[in-house]
């Protein structure tokens, strides 16, 4: 047997050249090799690293020594090597086994710090202790082979709460590492989680575990009525959030599709399914069951919901309370008068009173309730009382609008006999009974018309005052834009006025007018007077608007004149500059022409001089040639001998 392996080396069957070992038997001693004939080659373990494989018949003892379970206790100063050997002997059959023994890096660091006299060591001192006291690290102290285990020691120091870092007193020195006496025994929490609120997280997790245990003991099953798989986490299927105010009552569960980070799909690939867990209905999306009659809500849950609804109602802004009260009072008076007129005239069976008045903003919420009107209900429950439509606009009632005639048209014989019963769902008389007392209803409708005319007169009087005040505010307030008051939206009618006279009059006052409109006393024949007054007020407002437009036009004209003057001045300056530039260009061209003429004259003079020089030179050469010719000595020939 060899050290470090669980079985013998396999025997060789062939040599490096491919020859079988049995063929060499004749060469080695002339016989067969002992122990090599008839045996198959044995397999070798693939991994020869730590930890070594255990034997097949090994049984781990059930109980371990208590002294080996808690490794955070401080060791007394003494022989550290003996302490390590004792720990190795105690943990001989433990599940954690390393190349140097059965102790982890954290245990070794704990022994190293505990063996120091002052119970503190620096990082370099911990390295030295490892090399000196652990046999495995004795030959791994150099820089090449110590990078791995030194990195592991640094990680264990920073990630375990049992070790505490203390600043060194000296400058430029590494910090001290000490044992934390307040550390909890057992597996410590990683220090990386210290950035989170660990205490709050631990409390919340503990409460959630207790609640889950209580639900399991009571036999509460998850939302899907299926037993969870063993690999599923505790929080999956029972998602509780105790910190939420809605869930403080307990037992409020979310959808089973919601999962926390711990129960991700990456760790539960075997439980994935392409089919959705549950087809959620709109009621299930909010966590409430379908059967609303059997729902049970705790008191805390109900209080939380009431607080939420109260806060939401406070934030909503409705219309002005004073306007609501006035409209409600007017509506109640009209309803009482209508009821008195119908009951006194016809003697119909007692009907329930109509519903109270509601502002226009809340009519959409009451669409499913039956409405009461004189013109009959509209399909779908959208018909509202006629005075509500009149109260929606203040300006229409002051003019000759069709809104005022709706109530009168609704009291025709046909409408009374055909549309009274559907408005009141509690009483539905037959057509014969309606025909019998339809005449009586028509007799009593005359009183109703008189009362309604009086009410309309009062309303028109109030609306006239409001309308005039609005017109004055729009005209006199300079901060408001003129677009808010648009006469095109109102059916004014045929108004005749002399625009030129108005313009001349307002131009004389420079557009500064102080408008004071006296309120006329309204008699019983109010509709015609109101129409005349309204037309006059509208004409005055239109004249004021035209005056403002004329002032604007005059100011715009003055500004236009100034702009024209500035433009003319600019044009004159530009023309002067252009003339000056043209003069400069002409002067420059004249100078260039003079220079060119001078150059031409110089060239002509040079050419004449050169021709004279050439002529003189040729004459001189001719003279020289003549001189040479005549300066040669003449040859004197002697006379002949016969001349004496």
Curated annotation (Swiss-Prot):
Record keywords: Activator, Cell cycle, Cytoplasm, Developmental protein, Differentiation, DNA-binding, Growth regulation, Nucleus, Phosphoprotein, Transcription, Transcription regulation
DNA bind region: 100-206
Domain of life: Eukaryota
GO biological process assignments: cell differentiation; glucose homeostasis; negative regulation of cell growth; negative regulation of cell population proliferation; negative regulation of insulin receptor signaling pathway; regulation of DNA-templated transcription; regulation of lipid metabolic process
Localization: Cytoplasm; Nucleus
Annotated PROSITE patterns: FORK_HEAD_2, FORK_HEAD_3
Keyword Phosphoprotein on entry: yes
Extent of Low complexity compositional bias: 329-340, 360-374
A GO cellular component annotation in the UniProt record: cytoplasm
Molecular function GO terms recorded: DNA-binding transcription factor activity; DNA-binding transcription factor activity, RNA polymerase II-specific; RNA polymerase II cis-regulatory region sequence-specific DNA binding
Region Disordered, residue ranges: 39-75, 187-210, 222-276, 329-386, 412-435, 578-612
Sites of Phosphothreonine modification: 49
PANTHER family assigned to the protein according to its UniProt record, in alphabetical order: FORKHEAD BOX PROTEIN O
Full protein name: Forkhead box protein O
Gene behind this protein: foxo
